[in-house]
């Protein structure tokens, strides 16, 4: 399977499982799980050929571990990044490291300096434990700025943190006072 096919399939799965399952007639439960057979069938009706083998390659080979298969391998979900209001992952609050990072583009800094980090259309703000991960994320949007987040101080003031299955840290928002541009 070519790298391009796997990458295109990953983008398609992200779109469908995080944002628009109805685009192919897929139903997700409140935890974001969708039936793989229904996914394959819905994709085919919309001109995209998927197979279990290809889906498993994408799930297992994705370096960011964006997707998970159910124990019986009959269902799939995105592990975070949802904008679909019907999906409400039941995540447990977790003690974050003292400092977390967020990568963004310089063009977003005026808004961040005014409003802090907000989830936009997603359910949570995404943070990482490693600067390199934050840099890789931020570079997708232009000239990168790494933001250091004082997670320890946020938690002390009552903010809640969660960690997705793939290690991404999540929180509802990050107010300006907890952000330092590096």
UniProtKB/Swiss-Prot annotation:
Matching NCBIfam families: PRK00819.1-4
Biological process annotations from GO: tRNA splicing, via endonucleolytic cleavage and ligation
Protein origin, superkingdom: Bacteria
Keyword hit for NAD: yes
Taxonomic lineage from the root: Bacteria, Pseudomonadati, Pseudomonadota, Gammaproteobacteria, Pseudomonadales
Record-listed E.C. numbers: 2.7.1.-
Recorded family membership: Belongs to the KptA/TPT1 family.
Alphabetized UniProt keyword annotations: NAD, Transferase
Xref: Pfam families: PTS_2-RNA
A molecular-function term among this protein's GO annotations: NAD+ poly-ADP-ribosyltransferase activity
InterPro entries recorded: Ptrans_KptA/Tpt1, RNA_2'-PTrans_C, RNA_2'-PTrans_KptA, RNA_2'-PTrans_N
UniProt name for this protein: Probable RNA 2'-phosphotransferase
Function (record text): Removes the 2'-phosphate from RNA via an intermediate in which the phosphate is ADP-ribosylated by NAD followed by a presumed transesterification to release the RNA and generate ADP-ribose 1''-2''-cyclic phosphate (APPR>P). May function as an ADP-ribosylase.
